[in-house]
Amino acid sequence: MLELNLTMQDALQSAAPNATLAAKLQLYGQFVGAWRADIEYRALDGSKRHAEGEWHFGWVLDGKAIQDVWIFPARRLRGERPEPWFGYGSTFRWYNPAIDAWHIAWFDPGRSIELRQIGRAAGRDIVQIGESQPGVLRRWRFTDIADASFRWIGDISWDRGVTWTLDMEMRAARA
């Protein structure tokens, strides 16, 4: 019998990775938990903006995918400083054995932004690449990965990947 007394959260979240894919899922599974993020955004004019954010990763959809929620400024700071620069987005990541890579779908409904990428391990790093608009590539990299910290780098290419420009960097530490 269908249990209709479960919440959406109960139906979405999983306690662990799905056993059939557990080894492959650890590429992003290593991030499951809560993180503090120091964020630096670099605008095209060279100016920089800083924010303290939070980033939460968890198992979802029968443990076959990982969802994260990325928030900046951190919720505890939202009332203290008016900040026109903000984000409240989410990413779904799921492994596709047919291509031995990850599908990534990120969206920020408050700013009406979305991006699809393909992600793969690159040595000790993780690299995700997708097209944000015709001819414009976005590359997101997880680097310097340790048990309690990592660095995330967002690059943009206006020439289909010939050259890249850093536009955002985050240093994350486990909360």
Where are these regions (language model features)?
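Hydrophobic small-molecule pocket/channel-lining residues, especially in calycin-type beta-barrels
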Residues: 1-175
